[in-house]
């Protein structure tokens, strides 16, 4: 993190820090925005970690960019509704957001333990309170074939290609969502 900040300062580069999942990780490092507030656009949201329907988030940025960011925000027309903003602010102020976050962390922690037990002996990546598990797929499968086979067996997974930035060489895999409970 410190090295990234040094490089950004040396080359006068701005940093965009997406911490939408961060609140679910109690031991995460301090945000880069804390190390380099003069060049970091930091955003987080209540949507990912508190409640999906609560489409409300926060953006902090260097003061010099506030006007430009506000103008672009209005142009893109991505705005929280007044009701969602009011609910989000009240929940933060009265402690409801913190209680819901703790509940979510507990529920996801249990689901991650179940996933680890089921996937025992299979290499996978996850975070203790994370909402997703990354599962590399065996070389004999394509992502599409694996996804189709999983769905035929009642398991919904997303192909890694849905999250790739390019078609460059990458590890084939699927993302398993632990955030939605099925009945």
Segments the model singles out, each with a brief description of its role:
Residues 105-116, 124-137, 146-149:
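Conserved glycine-rich beta-strand-loop-beta hairpin in the small C-terminal domain of fold type I
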Residues 41-106:
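Conserved core segment of the aminotransferase class I/II
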Residues 60, 134-138, 177-179:
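Short hydrophobic/aromatic beta-strand micro-patches
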Residues 2, 114-119, 178-183:
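Short, intrinsically disordered, charge-balanced linker/junction segments flanking boundaries
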Residues 1-14, 19-51:
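Active-site pre-lysine segment of PLP-dependent enzymes
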Residues 152-153, 167-183:
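PLP-dependent enzyme catalytic core of the Aspartate aminotransferase-like
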């Amino acid at each position: 993190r410190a090295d990234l900040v040094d490089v950004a300062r040396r080359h006068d580069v701005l940093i965009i820090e997406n911490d939408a999942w961060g609140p679910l990780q109690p031991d995460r490092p301090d945000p880069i925005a804390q190390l380099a507030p003069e060049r970091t656009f930091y955003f987080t949201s209540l949507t990912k970690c508190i409640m999906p329907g609560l489409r409300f988030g926060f953006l902090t940025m260097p003061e010099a960019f506030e006007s430009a960011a506000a103008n672009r925000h209005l142009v893109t027309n991505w705005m929280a509704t007044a009701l969602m903003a009011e609910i989000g602010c009240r929940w933060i102020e009265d402690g409801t957001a913190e209680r819901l976050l703790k509940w979510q962390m507990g529920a996801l922690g249990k689901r991650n333990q179940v996933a680890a037990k089921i996937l025992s002996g299979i290499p996978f990546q996850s975070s203790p309170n994370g909402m997703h598990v990354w599962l590399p797929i065996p070389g004999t499968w394509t992502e599409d074939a694996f996804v189709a086979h999983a769905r035929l067996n009642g398991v919904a997974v997303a192909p890694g290609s849905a999250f790739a930035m390019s078609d460059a060489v990458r590890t084939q895999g699927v993302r398993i969502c632990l955030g939605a409970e099925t009945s």
